[in-house]
Amino acid sequence: SASYASLLKDQNVQPYVRNIAKFAPVPFDNGLALPAKYLVFTRAKAVTLTAQEMTEKVAASTSVFAANGAQTLRFGQIITGNDIGQHLLGVSYQSMSAIEATYDALAQDTNFRQLTAGVEVNMRSIIQLYT
């Protein structure tokens, strides 16, 4: 598209990886209207869990994300590129303190502990958004 071409040419962006993910049906509606300031992406490879089990564990943990400040949450499987078959969790937040509170609470959540025990996390990125 023209927008993508402009991003590469005018903004001097150089993508080093590009993937497409198929999102899983994980209900999440925190209802927060504030604009997100941070995105956290976590990529993981299944070790002992099936894709269905991973989706169920993420879905069972969404209340912990919401209670600690997550604004949006999406989970899916990467279907193109170098990381095909791996899973991606994307969550938006208003602040770094909300990210920290969420991960502190997730460490106590049985479903999330079972999820992390059954996968190999191989990438986590925190991206600050500027508006």
Describe the predicted segments one by one:
Residues 1-131:
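Short S/T/G/P-rich N-terminal loop/turn motif that feeds into the first structured element of a domain
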